[in-house]
């Protein structure tokens, strides 16, 4: 039972870190990346559809993205969705091709994005600490119901703390890496 609590905590911490990585992938750096457009949804076929399901996205020349829309009737919808997103990009439409040129980030915008990255990292750390708290509470509940001894509680809490420290270190590395990527001109 104790091992199951540890495994559950580790799985939840890993999912939190993965969610942070996915979230940071959509933060715009100076380089073009198809993941930049992951959050864009298009009204297609009666529902909100992710852009990557109605078009292919590729990188061209490092600082531009080329979107090839599968259905040429959807080009206008894709263009509107890009304008509506908060990415600040201006699409150039030529038939089923949409080109997005990414202007270099200003120093001010880089600093703003660094703050956003740092904030998301802190939110993830809070989530990890909450997972630790939940796991420790489950361990204490097991002690109350006399399923485990005091020594097992102490060892269990130490193991959970080690998992937490490892996860927080991983979050710090992810955030630092993204901040370096942002500050590289």
UniProtKB/Swiss-Prot annotation:
Q: Which GO terms describe its molecular function?
A: ribosomal large subunit binding
What keywords are annotated for this sequence in UniProt? Cytoplasm, Protein biosynthesis
Note the superkingdom of the native organism. Bacteria
In the record, biological process GO terms are:
cytoplasmic translational termination
| GO-annotated cellular components | cytosol
Principal cellular location given in the protein's record: cytoplasm
UniProt subcellular location: Cytoplasm
Q: Which InterPro entries match?
A: Ribosome_recyc_fac, Ribosome_recyc_fac_dom, RRF_sf
Q: What does this protein do?
A: Responsible for the release of ribosomes from messenger RNA at the termination of protein biosynthesis. May increase the efficiency of translation by recycling ribosomes from one round of translation to another.
Q: Which family does it belong to?
A: Belongs to the RRF family.
Q: Which HAMAP family match?
A: RRF
This one is known as Ribosome-recycling factor
Q: What is the gene name?
A: frr
């Amino acid at each position: 039972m104790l091992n199951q609590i540890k495994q559950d905590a580790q799985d939840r911490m890993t999912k939190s870190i993965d969610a942070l990585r996915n979230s940071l992938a959509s933060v715009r750096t100076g380089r073009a990346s198809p993941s930049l457009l992951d959050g864009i949804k298009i009204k297609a076929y009666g529902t909100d559809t992710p852009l990557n399901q109605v078009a292919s996205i590729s990188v061209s020349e490092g600082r531009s993205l080329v979107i090839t829309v599968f259905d040429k009737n959807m080009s206008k919808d894709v263009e509107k969705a890009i304008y509506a997103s908060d990415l600040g990009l201006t699409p150039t439409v030529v038939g089923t091709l949409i080109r997005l040129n990414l202007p270099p980030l200003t120093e001010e915008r880089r600093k703003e994005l660094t703050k956003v990255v740092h904030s998301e990292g802190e939110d993830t750390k809070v989530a990890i600490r909450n997972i630790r708290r939940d796991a420790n509470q489950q361990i204490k509940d097991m002690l109350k119901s006399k399923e485990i001894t005091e020594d097992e509680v102490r060892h269990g809490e130490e193991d959970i703390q080690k998992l937490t420290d490892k996860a927080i270190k991983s979050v710090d590395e992810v955030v630092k890496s993204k901040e370096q990527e942002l500050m590289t001109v």
